[in-house]
Amino acid sequence: FKNKSSKLIPIKENLVDKLDHKYAKSRVKKFYRIKDEDAGQVSSKKISQLLKILAKKSIEIQFISSPENIAWLLNLRGNDSNFAPIPNCYLIIDKNKNIYLFCDPQKINKNLKKNLKFLQIVNIKFLGAFLENIHNKRVLIDETTCSFFYQNILSNQNAVIKEVDPIYHLKSIKNKTEIRNTIKSHIFDGVA
């Protein structure tokens, strides 16, 4: 590209999604929540812990682009990967506890929607437009998981703080249930 004076231009639509549209509809797999007793901690407590960290750093909004962190925070799981129960989604949380989950709405059944009544479910195709409407805020992103495209959108009108997602730290402190389940999974993995 260098010698040909080519230039990469970002586009708003994912061209692969346009080609894969019919196939994608036939393979929609629903999200689900794990029981609080299986997670060892209710998601509301995890959210409160995260909000305390954000308040200490004077962060007004966090854009969470790591699906595994969203899975942990909400006790939410998905079948979007063959090898891990990770839901393909993004999350925005603000200092006032407004939470927006961006995903394919077909992946949310009525029962799950009731369980997630503390947040708003937004079609993932509106994520870019939603981010463009955030102005004059201190926004935390983790640049190791946030795409350059979304970083650029947020940087246009906001003070973007690039730090490691604080959820990684919260996840590293295991509760008794998580420790017990980790030991179980190692045993099952060893037997296999």
Residue ranges and their predicted role:
Residues 1-192:
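Active-site neighborhoods and metal-handling regions in enzymes and metal-associated proteins
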